[in-house]
């Protein structure tokens, strides 16, 4: 795609819901300008468009405004990361769950009681707390960290509780 045709749309990751919604609305309006001009628009995302993607909010807004839009699946970051770590996410009759860490340790503990294997997305700022919980359960060695997969600063390896992790950090906790 020629550079003059590429438009970057940045989203805020603010904890302020009003700011996030305003940013998403502005993104939808920007896209609508091009669609109204008869142009085709593609919006690549990091990971898969259907798994915790900010685009899904823009997608809903475009549909609400009457535009015909389509989501095309990508490779979820936890699948790409598991491949890079050379581990399967599940085997045989195992089950797995995917949750955000944003709701706290209680949700993580409940999910661990239900699923054989667990994927925790956006865990970067909560790694130490999850590590302490895993250590109390004797499972700290069963966690793999996947951070910035495919981007600068990529890390795929064991959970290191004293390491700094960014927003795009996922943890896979394998069964015993």
Name every feature range the model reports, one short phrase each.
Residues 8, 43-45, 71-74, 91, ...:
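General beta-strand structural signal in soluble alpha/beta enzymes
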Residues 17, 45-46, 68, 95-96, ...:
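Flexible, glycine/proline-enriched loop segments at strand-loop-helix junctions
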Residues 41, 112-176:
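A contiguous loop/helix-start segment that scaffolds small-molecule binding in enzyme catalytic cores
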Residues 50-111, 162:
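Class I SAM-dependent methyltransferase SAM-binding "motif I" and its flanking Rossmann-like core
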Residues 1-67, 157, 161, 169-170, ...:
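Class I S-adenosyl-L-methionine
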Residues 19-26, 53, 76, 103, ...:
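Conserved active-site and cofactor/substrate-binding residues in soluble primary-metabolism enzymes
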Residues 35, 93-107, 151-153, 168-176:
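Short, basic, helix/turn surface patches
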Residues 14, 76-79, 127, 151-153:
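Short gly/pro/ser/thr-enriched loop/turn and capping motifs at secondary-structure boundaries
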């Amino acid at each position: 795609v020629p550079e003059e045709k590429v438009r970057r749309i940045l989203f805020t990751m603010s904890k302020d819901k009003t700011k996030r919604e305003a940013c998403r609305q502005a993104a939808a309006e920007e896209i609508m300008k091009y669609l109204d001009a008869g142009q085709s628009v593609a919006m690549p995302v990091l990971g898969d468009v259907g798994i915790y993607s900010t685009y899904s909010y823009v997608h809903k807004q475009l549909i609400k405004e009457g535009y015909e839009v389509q989501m095309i699946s990508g490779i979820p970051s936890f699948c790409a990361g598991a491949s890079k770590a050379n581990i399967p996410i599940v085997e045989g009759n195992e089950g797995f769950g995917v949750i955000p860490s944003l709701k706290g340790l209680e949700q993580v503990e409940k999910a661990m009681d239900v699923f054989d294997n667990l994927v925790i997305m956006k865990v970067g700022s909560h790694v130490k707390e999850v590590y302490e919980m895993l250590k109390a359960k004797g499972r700290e060695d069963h966690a793999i960290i996947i951070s910035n997969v495919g981007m600068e600063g990529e890390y795929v390896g064991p959970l290191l509780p004293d390491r700094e992790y960014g927003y795009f950090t996922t943890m896979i906790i394998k069964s015993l």
